[in-house]
Amino acid sequence: MKQFPFILLTCALAVPVLAQESKTNAATADVAASGQSFLASAAELTAPLALTNDYIYLTTAQAELQDGGKAVFNFSVTNAGNYQIETVVCAPDESSNSFFVNIDAPPVDPDMIWDIPLTSGFEKRVISWRGNGDSSTDQFTPKVFKLEVGAHTLVIVGREPGTLLKSLAILPAPPEKPATP
């Protein structure tokens, strides 16, 4: 199992490598009890998402769900349980801080919008879902995915230009804290 360290950089755009209709960059990776990390280049991309300088971004104006392209990460879980996804992203402003996200099915709008807290350059952020919340208060923070043993796909759809995804890690979710009486 390969582990990739997270790298902190500043946001920057460069010459894009545009996605083709379907571009496979990596095979399925196993997610063990300790988790699994992926660089953005491990995704299968469809336009208008693009890969440049080792990050994924939307090449067009704000996209509706059906127009945002896809970044698909294939992985396999060896231990059933609850998982969360930690990322390294750049979300510099309110117009550049969201993706659509789901596992094993296309995301649904607006429930599965991931509103990313603003960053100063590339920073770690855990995926959440808007659900019944709004752009400043997601309902599911963090979003915990219950996964069975076997093959899975993480689907990320572009939503706002300028939101950059550098890497991600699928990790076992920490145990839930008991409710305070």
Can you say where each PLM-predicted feature lies in the sequence?
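Positively charged n-region of N-terminal signal peptides that target proteins for export
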Residues: 1-4
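Extracytoplasmic
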Residues: 20-181
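Bacterial N-terminal signal peptides
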Residues: 7-16
